[in-house]
Amino acid sequence: KLKLENFLIKNKKKISCIILRYFNVAGVDKKLRCGFYTKKGSNLILNLCFALKKKNIFTVNGNDYETRDGTPIRDYIHVQDLAEIHLLAAKKILKKNFFKIFNCGYGHGYSVMEILKKFNFYSNSKIRYVIGKRRKNDIVISIADPKKIIQFLKWRPKHQNLEHVVKSSLKWYLKHI
């Protein structure tokens, strides 16, 4: 991703494009037709679903970060909002040639423990967890600044409610994993 982005930046006078930098994509489409799936990775929401479905113990990687509850904070953008951003960007670039880079997120975040608690609440279950070591080079807080994308594309977030993200993820993932 970085190599391609650097190539585009280097050639921005010759290429018309919009670069969309995703933050943490979450949720599934409203008709529950598709969702993100991988057997291995660092996707918190998917890993919580695995822990819930398989009754595994979930590892919280560190609780001594300089955050409100000691766990890392991330900006989660719902996949439906991200799809709308893509449509708006495509319409815009068809009308005029330019080069823009946008952060795709909401401008606020949730900690690992906040997400875990929401999963426990909405699943009516209790994901067992242990506190593990910090991940090497983990970013403490990663939150997008969406001002440019809101202004330029006239985008308005519609699905930034954490309840919607968690409930839709639970419905889809627990059926498909």
Explain the meaning of each model-derived region:
Residues 15-43, 66-71:
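Flexible, glycine-rich beta-alpha linker
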Residues 1-2, 34-46, 75-76, 109:
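Short-chain dehydrogenase/reductase
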Residues 1-28, 46-55:
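Active-site Tyr-X1-5-Lys
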Residues 50-177:
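C-terminal substrate-binding subdomain of Rossmann-fold SDR/epimerase-dehydratase oxidoreductases
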Residues 9, 45, 83, 87:
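Short alpha-helix within the catalytic core of nucleotide-sugar-dependent glycosyltransferases
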